[in-house]
Amino acid sequence: MGEVERRGNETDQHNIAPFESTPIVINGVLVFSTPSNRAIALDAETGQEIWQFDPQAGRIGPRQFFQHRGVTYWQSKTGGEGRILYGTFDGRLIALDAKTGKPCREFGKDGTVDLRAGVADAYPGAEYSVTSPPAIYQDLVITGAAVPEYPSKGPSGYVRAFDVRSGKLVWTFHTIPRPGEVGHESWEEDAWKQRTGANVWSIMSVDVERGWIFLPVGSASYDFYGADRKGMDLFSNCLVALEAATGKLVWYYQMVHHDIWDYDMPAQPVLITVRHDGRDIAAVAQLTKMGFVFILDRLTGKPLFPVEERPVPKSDVPGETTWPTQPFPVKPPPLVRQSFSENDISTLTPESNRYCAQLFHSLESHGMYTPYGRKMTLVVPGTLGGANWSGASFDRASGYLFVNVNELAAVGAMEPQAADAPLRYRRGSKEGEYARYWDEHQWPCQKPPWGTLNAVDVNTGLVVWKVPLGGVDELKVKTGTPNLGGTIVTDGGLVFIGATIDSRFRAFDMRTGEQLWAGDLEASAHATPITYMGKQSGRQFVVIAAGGGGYFKGRVSDALAAFALPD
């Protein structure tokens, strides 16, 4: 389809800003966002530019790189007016005329609402960024934000709804409950005050029929040390259902108690139908970094398959009080390995085996939910393990949920801080705070596969098939690769996905997991594709952003790649 010029502010000094946007298509026009928050509209069949808007977004806070996952669309009930809405890196909510790309002047101030107002006023230098597209319900635009992970005090992670025409605030949901609200008792003493985190940085889902919105809530800050927030820390690490019109709580389900692993809820909740006990049940599936898939009754928030509270290891860090148990779904089984032994060390090359074995023997690890300790610790899976923001796709006819996951562990230790530091301990390692358990080639230290594509039957709770996703060209075995980006599934029974670090776009047989096709890209596609029918030609297109960069670095590009069958 073409390339988007990568301007000076698209990237940081290493030129690694990932192109994570999933386009939307409205009446033959494809609209997407760039890492620097530009919104661009193209003819969906030719790729010819129609308009673009640059909000001149600046960087606030220590985020590693620019990233943005897309825009959303609202249309008036009469069908006449349409708006493109999205958030920016510097904490603004923008409304554009969908036809012209010009700001809607009656929205907020000249088309912009200052999202920092009321939640980040006391922290002018702290991050408050919107990296995921907001949700739309009727005439409301609903958004969360990315907030600091360190220190523990900072901008609020509340979810807010604004009038889509005027930009006026309609409701606020306190993801960290205030006195008198449900869940406030889960915060001991005054730990809730000025607490940052417990935010919704990922993508929300709306059940239009019921008028509910589902929030995947992140970890409370600081992610790896909870001595100043003893308790279960609601609504962190929860799936929360709200009345979309009012923000009123319907139900919640917590998937990690007192998180000290950065196991926030990274993925958009998937609204599914489950055939359970002889009847169809409206359900919601929540993917996690732990590799678990929680399948809940959409009306009640109760699990449809058994979930067991199991004892987990304790922390040896002074002041830390780990929660004694964590929830383990019995079905579906975890999609990634959750422990590591010497037998799991990679043997692909002598050099990799030697490096990884030496590192392994220097680390502490006691199975799933091992806390980062005072000694260097191996945590399996790590912060980039399991599923991530790209979520899953669902085929209702088969009941299959298609999920790509990472087999990535993490390494770190809790290091004492200076007396005047915000917290007594902070996670660190020789490679920085977010070190992965991989060798000098960024090949994970465990035996392959390193990344997989999975089909989960939500009716039975069983994994139907699992295949390696991606490969390393210089290695002969099917390793799979680390991956970020999601799937789509078509009526024709194809699952499309990029995501891998080998710069390829693939199609799989939905029923068997057999790879049917692979196409080369200019760079890896760390995004989720879209498919649509051409308004004029009637041809089916599949489009994906292929920009590389991000956590896995590699070569970068600005390509938006469009695929279609020949005429």
Provide a role label for each language-model segment.
Residues 326, 330-409, 418, 452:
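Long, low-complexity segments enriched in small/aliphatic residues
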Residues 150-151, 410-412:
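Short catalytic/ligand-binding loop motif for oxyanion handling, primarily in non-cytosolic enzymes
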Residues 16-36, 63-92, 126-151, 158, ...:
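Repeat-blade elements of multi-bladed beta-propeller folds
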Residues 177, 221, 409:
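Feature marks short, surface-exposed loop/turn motifs that line or immediately flank catalytic pockets
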Residues 1-31, 55-58, 376-384:
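Asp/Glu-centered strand-loop micro-motifs enriched in Gly/Pro and often flanked by an aromatic residue
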Residues 1-6, 39-61, 78, 93-124, ...:
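Extracytoplasmic/lumenal domain signature
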Residues 288, 311, 407-409:
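Glycine-rich beta-alpha junction loops
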